[in-house]
Amino acid sequence: MTDYSKATDGTKVIHDDPWLEPYKEVIKRRHNQVKNTIQKLEESEGSLLKFSQGYEYFGFNVTKDGVNYREWLPSAHEVYLVGDFNQWNKTSHPLERDNYGRWSIFIPNNSNGECAIPHGSKIKIYLKLANGNFDYRIPAWIKRVEQTKENPVFDGVFWNPSKQYVFKNKSPMKPTELRIYEAHVGMSSELPEISTYSKFKDTVLPMVKELGYNCIQLMAVMEHAYYASFGYQVTNFFAISSRFGTPEELKEMIDKAHEMGLLVFLDVVHSHASKNVLDGLNQLDGTDHHYFHSGGRGNHELWDSRLFNYGNWEVMRFLLSNLRFYVDEYHFDGFRFDGVTSMIYTHHGLSPACSYDDYFGGAVDEDALNYLTLANVMLHTLNPSIVTIAEEVTGLATLCRPFSEGGGDFDYRLAMGIPDKWIELVKEKKDEDWNMGTIAHMLSNRRYKEKNIAYAESHDQSLVGDKTLAFWLMDKEMYTNMSVTTEETPIIDRGMSLHKMIRLITSSLGGDGYLNFMGNEFGHPEWVDFPREGNNNSLHHARRRWDLYRNPLLRYKQLRDFDIAMNKAEQEFRWLSSDFAYISLKHEDDKIIVFERASLIFIFNFHPSKSFSDYRIGSGVPGKFINVLDSDRKEFGGHVRIGKDNYHYTEDKPWHDRKYSLLIYIPSRTCLVLKKVD
């Protein structure tokens, strides 16, 4: 039998999973493709890290003598730089072409030493396309674009402020337990408006800190022409969204987050790009195969977007440099890679692909997998503390194992099956039909040594056509029965109870990190719907109702206080970085789940009506236990049926394959956490 424990050819992952052995040649081939690419980069570009600094060569780069502008446009016949600086003269500033399809121009300073292109002025390229026609385009590496109300097509903007923001704070140390707050700057205001980086800095960051999260994951930062795309139809990859403010204001916001001890992750979209031609990458040089695959392979029919050719040298440079740019320029601490499933399969995840034959079969786009691994290796070489998260739904084996062992080098994957299962349960199943084994399995089923970020709901579950978990649970009664001055109705009682239980069991059993979408911590009602023609361009559902939790007469504050207590308990006991939980009980009739993790005992009673006194549960260790958190406390909207200060003593009586056991009272629809104190 082969010993893979010391393998250096990419097959070390087989040591922990013998089921991978039949696919060892595929694993080796993929590993070698990455190694060979890195070697080629070292020979032709200096190194992978130097290759990722493309933004220092391409695009606009200001020197003491003037401005260099370079662009890769292999099929263009003529290229001219035009803008306010030359009164939009179409021929006064021609670019020169080299043998690799790279065009360049140097614009010297004015005679007085000032930059010839004024800061904030509009700028574009005018080029003779592959078909011989002339047209305007936005430079691919542009760092600023802006729209007007009259014209939704972006204009390029030359960004060169006299005073650039200087960071004052270093990034915090990477925590061993990630508690992620997913946020969208534009919809972070409680007013029906598009919010800003500055307002987010002043209002949302303090809330995130108070809630006990240690990381913010920012959506929709990369520029996108269509606001209602939620930021997932990117037009300009090096430009941050101008709707929310300036690059300097985003830097100040991130710097403030770092001062507060918060990491900041970017939701990066490299899985596809907007089809926009006039202000996007599409047909930049007049061809459909410039940055993308040609023909049908270059189009995502469901998303109506373009698909990158990850095997192209300059596409790799562009995307790797894009990641490096956000680290170097904006000090982002990590990335959530959007749409990884779509990237790594030629069917884009639209066909079932959840077996080893699928993971190592012919439907995998190995160029895309090669790019993703290179991206992770580059980022982790640049700074080992950078965190990378894959939005990947099929559970592709080895994706989150180190590259040195044969993996894709991601730090985490999103546990995307968990929120789908919760929504399925609350939508389709009666409480009496909830299966405890199914719940325990969906939360604990993850690959060995591949970390998961668990979540009960993210932005995906809140989009129009769906609704938040709280709204599924309580629906229209949230409009009329959330007041603490009126008697709690059965629907509100059930919804409040299950909302707390679902979040705690997801955090404590579901993974190695935890994520929450902004506002859902207090049971945000309704759904998210960005302004569009179908809703008369309304911002009513593209905001966060922070006023609901601030109102002491409403029950939202109780849900929020439970979330704070849950995060505080996690920070103290660190269950997210602890070993897998030991599940000692999944009782279908009693609707009870019991498990141990981080030296704590977690007890959940999902039964809609039955409470149990002197209920025996197992424990792996003997001693005296006390309640450190329960969902039935008054401050959390509970019924105060569980004593906070009562001690529970184990007995030398084996129970459910545990050496010891203890008796507890478990009211219906409650959860509690016991800590050993002696």
Curated annotation (Swiss-Prot):
Membership in a protein family: Belongs to the glycosyl hydrolase 13 family. GlgB subfamily.
Its EC number(s): 2.4.1.18
Active site residues per record: 338, 391
Functional description taken from the UniProt entry: Glycogen-branching enzyme participates in the glycogen biosynthetic process along with glycogenin and glycogen synthase. Generates alpha-1,6-glucosidic branches from alpha-1,4-linked glucose chains, to increase solubility of the glycogen polymer.
InterPro entries per the UniProt record, alphabetical: A-amylase/branching_C, Branching_enzy, Glyco_hydro_13_cat_dom, Glyco_hydro_13_N, Glyco_hydro_b, Glycoside_hydrolase_SF, Ig-like_fold, Ig_E-set
Known partners and oligomeric status: Monomer.
Pfam family, one: CBM_48
Stored SUPFAM superfamilies: (Trans)glycosidases, E set domains, Glycosyl hydrolase domain
Keyword Chloroplast in annotation: no
Key word Ion transport present: no
The gene coding this protein: glgB
Protein name in UniProt: 1,4-alpha-glucan-branching enzyme
Top EC class, one word: transferase
GO cellular component: a single term: cytoplasm
Any one GO biological process: glycogen biosynthetic process
Keyword annotations: Glycogen biosynthesis, Glycosyltransferase, Transferase
Site note Transition state stabilizer, residues: 460
One annotated GO molecular function: cation binding
Source species of the chain: Dictyostelium discoideum (Social amoeba)
Pathway the protein takes part in: Glycan biosynthesis; glycogen biosynthesis
S-S bonds: none
Organism phylogeny: Eukaryota, Amoebozoa, Evosea, Eumycetozoa, Dictyostelia
UniProt catalytic activity: Transfers a segment of a (1->4)-alpha-D-glucan chain to a primary hydroxy group in a similar glucan chain
Protein residues bound to (1,4-alpha-D-glucosyl)n: 88, 124
